[in-house]
């Protein structure tokens, strides 16, 4: 069993605080045309005394040059999470499967398309009413 299969199949209740070096994660962004694979090469937990030990900040330093800081990570890693990357301000989607990441990106794209389509319709309606 490879590491990817092990991570997906055996960690149903794992949180980001449980991620270890060598784990495979997937990530993507709205402005990317693919979902990237990354292997965690370093993790750093910042446990906050005000929270339970399972709520923490995690920094992932990956082999492809990215560093992710995720705060308050009490989350099932099968639910793709969204956070803003501090360097470029883009929303980054990260999860344990390509499918989870892709679905969340598509969901956001669809909601944005719907938002702008609705706004366009309202604008056209108001514009026509003014005539």
What are these regions (language model features)?
Residues 2-20:
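Mixed-charge, Lys/Arg-rich low-complexity intrinsically disordered regions
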Residues 14-17, 31, 80-87:
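Eukaryotic intrinsically disordered, low-complexity tracts enriched in Ser/Pro/Thr/Gly and charged residues
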Residues 30-31, 64:
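Solvent-exposed strand-loop boundary residues in beta-sheet-rich modules
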Residues 31-49:
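Short beta-strand-centered aromatic/proline hotspots
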Residues 45-59:
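Short, solvent-exposed secondary-structure boundary/capping segments
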Residues 57-130:
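Intrinsically disordered, low-complexity, charged/polar segments
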């Amino acid at each position: 069993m490879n590491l990817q299969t092990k991570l997906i199949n055996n960690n149903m209740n794992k949180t980001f605080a449980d991620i270890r070096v060598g784990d495979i994660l997937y990530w993507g962004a709205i402005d990317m045309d693919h979902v990237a694979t990354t292997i965690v090469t370093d993790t750093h937990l910042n446990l906050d005394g005000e929270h339970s030990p399972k709520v923490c900040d995690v920094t992932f330093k990956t082999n492809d040059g990215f560093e992710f800081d995720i705060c308050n990570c009490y989350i099932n890693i099968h639910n793709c999470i969204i956070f803003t990357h501090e360097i470029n301000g883009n929303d980054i989607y990260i999860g344990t499967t390509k499918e989870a990441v892709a679905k969340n990106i598509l969901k956001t794209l669809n909601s944005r398309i719907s938002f702008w389509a609705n706004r366009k319709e309202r604008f056209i309606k108001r514009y026509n009413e003014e005539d």
